[in-house]
Amino acid sequence: MGQCKYCGQDAGFFSHMHKECEEKHSQGLTILEGAIRSYFKGATPMSEIVRVASHVKQNNYISDKDRSASSSKCIDEWTNTIHWPFHSSHLDKIKEFISNIGVSYQDINESGALDRLCQKMIRGFMAEYFTGQKPLQRSLQISQQVMRTLPLTVQKEQEAYYEMLGQAGKNFLKDGLMSPSEQQKVDEYIGTLGLSLINLPPSLKGTPIEEMGQASILSDIQAGRTPRYNLQAPIILGRGETAFWCYNNVTMFQEKVRREYVGRTGGFSFRIIKGVTYRTGGFKGHPVETSYMENMGVGSLYVTNKHIIFMGQMRSIKVPYSKIIGINPFSDGMEVQRDGNNVKRLVFQGFDCTFILNVLALIN
């Protein structure tokens, strides 16, 4: 006999619940979630939520796990409805809810609902800095107050800061360049929060944050300055050489030449004695060369003020800018043509080469 997971009584063969118990449980979830939604809309006091939660627990088989899941669901819904500017009333409301709902913070946040709420509020406070409504220190102070109620890991905190930086970058780069005042704001932001525009995690590659870092470097090169952001690269640089950028997971291909002889065999054969045949003529042919691109492996492509440097597990190569006679850009890489005798073409694949083209244009 199966046992009902709600009331604990016999549920019959091959069954784990009574239909009426399941319906009562579903009704309880609807009642609880409706009350929580009403609370976040400001229409129901917290005392009523506590009463409803106790009632459905006793009469509708609502467990603490159910209460946590319903709380998480309704918090996500509330997070999607509130918008910047945020006020202390938002923080007071969630603080009151967490303190009185009767389940742990960790259980409510099992799916990350409280983290998402905190990150959204932090982005809002940082938006006030980028729009000139608050100094950065004040926005940071308010964010720290929020995180005392809604704690975040360092990783999730930085995710919120980076996401706001990306939104700011999208606005700043509408015309392709940042103004001096916008650059100053970005420098203060990343300097204060310990962020970077060049040593980015893979998830931020190809985002406005990467574009801002590249735009800042190009602006410094154009002005004759050493770029303000230092790239920590595991390569040996020459005297006066500075590393600007690094593209990871780049595949290098190098042109190879295959030579073979193509021709035909002429002449005829005749029998001399049994078992012995004599053949006249011979092979006439000519060499034919074909070129192909050989995969040289995956590695990192570094851009400096003097070279393009590829560091891979199978092969590494340094290409001086002075030896480059042409670059053919692709949507996902570039072909490099070099000066010199018997120098083969190189293809680098797996990145947007726009930044390299701009560096070459400014340096040369």
Question: Where in the sequence are the language-model features?
Answer:
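Short, cysteine/histidine-rich loop/knuckle motifs that typically chelate Zn2+
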Residues: 5-8, 19-23
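Short Cys/His-rich "knuckle" micro-motifs
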Residues: 12-17, 28-30
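Short metal-binding segments enriched for Cys and/or His
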Residues: 25-37
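Structural recognition of alpha-solenoid helical scaffolds
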Residues: 31, 48, 52, 66-74, ...
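Amphipathic, non-membrane alpha-helical rod segments
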Residues: 46-64, 77-105, 132-152, 178-199
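Acidic, Ser/Thr- and proline-rich intrinsically disordered linker/docking segments
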Residues: 235, 297, 302, 309-364
